[in-house]
Structures are given as C-alpha cells and as structure tokens.
Amino acid sequence: MTRGRSVESVHAARGVVCRAGGAEESCVGDPVMLTFWRSAMKPFQALPLIEDGVIDEFGFGENEIALACASHGATDEHLVVVEGMLRKLDIEADALHCGAHPPFDKDAAFSLRCSGSEPGRIHNNCSGKHAGMLALARHHGWNPDGYWKLDHPVQQRIRAALR
C-alpha cells in the first residue's frame, strides 16, 4: 500500500477463485499450498444457524450471530452474549468443548486475575462458535455429546453447507 510515493506497508496474499463446480478461475500465489482455516472458517460454520432457522428458534440477534462467526476477547460484553446464548439453550458452560484460557482482552484478563477467579470455557475466544454448534444440535434434536467430532451430525451439517 502506498501513500503518495511512499510505500506504507506490504501485504502478502494468496487466493484462488473457483467456479461453483470447483474449476479454478483465477489464482494469486500457490493454489495448492496447505493452509489451515482456523478462525476464518467460523462464518461458514455458522451458516446452518441461519439456513436451518436456529437463530429464529432461539431468538439470537446480531450479537449472538457475530460471536458465532468470530473470535472474542472475553470482555464483559462478550461474556453476557455467550452466557445469554447458553441460557436460551438451557445448557451450562461446561458443555462447551473448548478449553479454558485467560481472556484475550488484556483488561478482561487482568480483571479476572484480580478477582481470584480461574478462566473457564466461556472465556475461550471460540465459545460463541461452540454455543452456536450446541444450538444447531438442540434445534435438530441431536445429542450434543461429541458435537465437535467430524462424524457428529453437527459437523456433517456444517460440511454440507460448504458444498
């Protein structure tokens, strides 16, 4: 990126544009480079929440959808949303299959540490995504046990949304 005649920053990018059938249309960089989706996958993992009517059934609004689609810093604002999702599902935070770690937000981490409390699963930056997956299981009447495993109906439904 330039500002006037000065180079302000340089960004490396790789990308592939494919047709619906999978044929490569255009490419920048190595199209077969192995990469990991990580959090970039979250919006796609949340598609069934919208397509299947999960958000309507449980009254999820923009904040719940946003946390199902993104990582969060475990600020008080974020925790209220995730706790609300779990309350609407009548599910406890220990049902989330994401490990506990300190909040990514430095002020939230400091406050938690000063309170003498330990981080819980709800503080995990992925807890909104996991709450969304539990909502998908609840909506369809699927047993939530193992919802993170590839052979579980939740993961199979997410895979189907990607096709």
Task: Label the model's feature ranges.
Residues 1-32:
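Beta-lactamase-like hydrolase cores
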Residues 8, 38-43, 60, 75-79:
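Generic structural signal for well-ordered secondary structure
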Residues 13, 43-48, 80-84:
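N-terminal, well-ordered alpha-helical segments
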Residues 16, 48-49, 136:
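Proline/glycine-anchored alpha-helix kink/cap motifs
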Residues 31, 35-39:
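Short, contiguous acidic and Ser/Thr-rich linear segments
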Residues 38-54:
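Active-site SXXK
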Residues 56-58:
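Hydrophobic alpha-helical segments, chiefly the membrane-spanning helices
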Residues 61-163:
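Active-site-adjacent helix/loop patches that line small-molecule binding or acyl-intermediate pockets
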